[in-house]
Amino acid sequence: MFKNPAERPRKLHELSSALEIPYDELRLNCVYCKGQLTETEVLDFAFTDLTIVYRDDTPHGVCTKCLRFYSKVSEFRWYRYSVYGTTLEKLTNKGICDLLIRCITCQRPLCPEEKQRHLDKKKRFHNIGGRWTGRCIACWRRPRTETQV
């Protein structure tokens, strides 16, 4: 489909524009389980702003089940440390709103309100493999079952 790696779209909106197909008509397979993503999963992939992966010049996304599973695997393998928001700002020399912080469970980028909630509730941000994570509002309410990082 896209032979030249330099010309490959990296985000779903770029792929949609390149193929001139709306999001809801895009058909992607999961890079892990090889199953076809549902329409909802394609839209979630776009909203999560993850990068498209190419296998044999074909674009792949990730289904919700595999995304949550491999997020947990990454947490177990690559967890480094946790810090409060004020400490994170001092470590990075950036404001909390200027940092890309993703949800530890669903990988959605946290909005400023979700980051502020961590500060208000005195919850920590986690460094997992050099990337900062927290919890989005949707995952905030779900109880953590295996680990309390």
Swiss-Prot record:
Gene: E6
Note: Belongs to the high risk human alphapapillomavirus family. The cancer-causing human papillomavirus E6 protein has a unique carboxy terminal PDZ domain containing substrate.
Entry keywords, A to Z: Activator, DNA-binding, Early protein, Host cytoplasm, Host nucleus, Host-virus interaction, Inhibition of host innate immune response by virus, Inhibition of host IRF3 by virus, Inhibition of host RLR pathway by virus, Metal-binding, Modulation of host cell apoptosis by virus, Oncogene, Transcription, Transcription regulation, Viral immunoevasion, Zinc, Zinc-finger
Lineage: Viruses, Monodnaviria, Shotokuvirae, Cossaviricota, Papovaviricetes
Subunit structure and binding partners: Forms homodimers. Interacts with ubiquitin-protein ligase UBE3A/E6-AP and thus forms a complex with human TP53. Interacts with human NFX1 and MAGI3. Interacts with human IRF3; this interaction inhibits the establishment of antiviral state. Interacts with human TYK2; this interaction inhibits JAK-STAT activation by interferon alpha. Interacts with host DLG1; this interaction leads to the proteasomal degradation of DLG1.
Protein name (Swiss-Prot/TrEMBL): Protein E6
Record localization: Host cytoplasm; Host nucleus
One Pfam entry name: E6
Cross-referenced InterPro entries: E6, E6_sf
